Amino acid sequence: MSKRDYYEVLSVGRDASEREIKKAYKRLAMKFHPDRNPGDKAAETSFKEVKEAYEILTDSDKKAAYDQFGHAGVDPNRGGGGFGGNADFGDVFGDVFGDIFGGGRRGGGQRQAARGSDLRYNLELSLEEAVKGLTKELRIPTLAHCDTCDGSGAKKGTSPTTCGTCHGQGQVQMRQGFFAVQQACPTCHGRGKIIKDPCNSCHGEGRVEKSKTLSVKIPAGVDNGDRIRLSGEGEAGEFGAPPGDLYVQVSVREHAIFVRDGNNLYCEVPISFGKAALGGEIEVPTLDGKVNLKIPAETQTGRMFRMRGKGVKSVRSHAVGDLLCKVVMETPVKLNERQKELLREFDETLAGSSSKKHSPKAEGFFDGVKKFFQDLNS
């Protein structure tokens, strides 16, 4: 049977701290401890499940492998790069309290075969891929429907029989003091069926481990944290039950030039002192190629220019963001003597009473400093 997501087992988020994980473990371990639930096989199973989840999520190496590859990353018998493992996005509480209160969502009738687990695949994209969209081939390790037994778990020509202990319910009732509690049937392990002659291919599970390749269309404009759901592409369900879903989790690598914020892109463009003072045109990179940007005379370093429609097209609407270019004036380096002399001459022309009109910000700054010291000494 497929394992539940470890974070779900402990009822914590994927960003939970080690302290939060330990706190959740202590609470659940106390709840399901065998000493507090004598003879309760369901509680014993839950206790083992909680303990296993805790051991994985508090070991930094195992946790990193699990976060990247899911159960495949911590199970030596399974593997698959980029694969995110089981991630059951269903109702946590139905699973936790189901055995105690008569099967939770399953109701009081015959035990239904479990739906397949949801899967998660971590997909890393470049900024260009995320902005423009593309089709990706993904190789997914999963549990697939066994073709040999057609998912029944029984050898061809035979069929599962109804469990005589629970009469197909998958649960038995036990009394603990004043309370009557239900737990998984110890004979059929909650399945409601007994397979006397199991299939040689799946060993009675009705599912086999396989890898499948999917062609997934990534829409233009996706961003970090976006999740694409592929219905029915998760693990096969138990004994013919519906399959789970596949969730493709998108992350976008940092770009060497651009920073994305929503649908807008930001970049810094270096300009020379002469270009900033006299104005002119500069080349600016965009995701569609270079474009010219007109710089007015007397442009100060840090000024932001907006190029409308040069950002990212929204994945959820027809809106297109802008490209915001911040110009940064560079101080020239490795000057020869002639260049230094010219700069000295230029600097001298700015000195004196006329310097204020050439450096309005400097004038305001030094006037403020002068007033500060006057107030300090008064």
Swiss-Prot record:
Checking SUPFAM superfamilies in the record gives: Chaperone J-domain, DnaJ/Hsp40 cysteine-rich domain, HSP40/DnaJ peptide-binding domain
**Main site of residence?**
cytoplasm
Residues involved in Zn(2+) 2 binding: C163, C166, C185, C188
InterPro entries associated with the record: DnaJ, DnaJ_C, DnaJ_domain, DnaJ_domain_CS, HSP40/DnaJ_pept-bd, HSP_DnaJ_Cys-rich_dom, HSP_DnaJ_Cys-rich_dom_sf, J_dom_sf
What are the recorded GO MF terms, alphabetically?
A: ATP binding; heat shock protein binding; unfolded protein binding; zinc ion binding
Its GO CC terms are:
cytoplasm
Cofactor or coenzyme needed:
Zn(2+)
The record lists Zn(2+) 1 as bound by C146, C149, C199, C202
**Tell me, what's a Pfam family for it?**
DnaJ_C
Could you tell me what the cofactor note in this record states?
Binds 2 Zn(2+) ions per monomer.
Q: Which residues form the J domain?
A: 5-70
Instruction: List the PROSITE patterns.
Output: DNAJ_1 (PS00636), DNAJ_2 (PS50076), ZF_CR (PS51188)
Q: Tell me the GO BP annotations in alphabetical order.
A: chaperone cofactor-dependent protein refolding; DNA replication; protein refolding; response to heat
Domain topic, free-text comment: The J domain is necessary and sufficient to stimulate DnaK ATPase activity. Zinc center 1 plays an important role in the autonomous, DnaK-independent chaperone activity of DnaJ. Zinc center 2 is essential for interaction with DnaK and for DnaJ activity.
Q: How does it assemble?
A: Homodimer.
What family name appears in the similarity comment?
Answer: Belongs to the DnaJ family.
- What this protein is called in its record is Chaperone protein DnaJ
> What organism is the protein native to?
Shewanella woodyi (strain ATCC 51908 / MS32)
Lineage at the top is: Bacteria, Pseudomonadati, Pseudomonadota, Gammaproteobacteria, Alteromonadales
